[in-house]
Amino acid sequence: MSISPLMPVYPRCGVRPVKGDHCHLIDEDGTRYLDFASGIAVNLLGHSHSGLIGAIQKQAETLMHVSNLYGSPQGEALAQRLVDKTFADTVFFTNSGAEAVETAIKTARAYHQHEDGDANRTELITFTNAFHGRTMATISASNQEKMHKGFMPLLAGFQYAEFDNLDHAKSL
């Protein structure tokens, strides 16, 4: 049995891009493809946008990453802008959608453990056929058998409402 050095997480299509140009991918032979995903999930940025390249270069010249052990004037300023322009009171930066969903799960459970005192409120409702990520909690939050296969036992505490069926969600 041979295994790819790059773990296969999706069935791969035949396109093998080596470069991107705004909303296009360019393969090894120079063929251009319109990229309707323009990245995926948290990276919907397109390809080679000069403004983004400039911002990344500027940041890379000053500071690449700061642990949560330290304060970050730039991070704090961005968090304040987000709080000022949204419903949020606080912000937690993550690097992936799965991490964001994990944080939402933990925040909801922590609220009931620490804030309202009803530690028995641990069940969360998610919708059928939804994708939440590839961590154990986000796989457990999905009702898709293909996501569960090979990862049993799942984490407890999720109920699945039929998508687009508010009455079913209310009944849970």
Set out the residue ranges of the language-model regions.
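Conserved active-site and cofactor/substrate-binding residues in soluble primary-metabolism enzymes
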Residues: M1, G20, H47, G51, ...
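Short, acidic, Ser/Thr-enriched surface-loop or helix-capping motifs
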Residues: D27-E28
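Active-site-adjacent loop/helix segments that line or gate small-molecule/cofactor pockets in enzymes
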Residues: M1-H24, L69, E162
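Short, well-ordered beta-strand elements within core beta-sheets of diverse protein domains
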Residues: H24, N43-L45, Q159-Y160
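Glycine-rich loop-to-alpha-helix module at the N-terminal edge of alpha/beta enzyme cores
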Residues: R32-A119, E123
